[in-house]
């Protein structure tokens, strides 16, 4: 399962990146970092993480909660969404 993790840096970006430099991502085995982008003001990070066991994600977030507020949203790929939610003709503009 993939998750969109919206991270808000509660004390700014500097302490988050300082810890990252010192300790790395601190992700437990089985939790995969996929990709991320950061807002230009450095206040938030939008990360895609993947794991089969949600408790791995919870354990990872616990190590960062003193610096980061998290919102977790289960996500699927656009291709999977097109297959799952499309009705016949909806993608071609037919009604």
Predicted regions and their residues:
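Short, flexible helix/strand-to-coil boundary loops that buttress conserved ligand/catalytic motifs
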Residues: 61
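Short S/T/G/P-rich N-terminal loop/turn motif that feeds into the first structured element of a domain
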Residues: 1-34, 38-44, 52-56, 76-95
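A short, polar/proline- and glycine-enriched secondary-structure boundary/capping micro-motif
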Residues: 16, 58, 69-71
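Conserved short beta-strand edge segments in small beta-sheet-based binding/regulatory domains
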Residues: 67-78
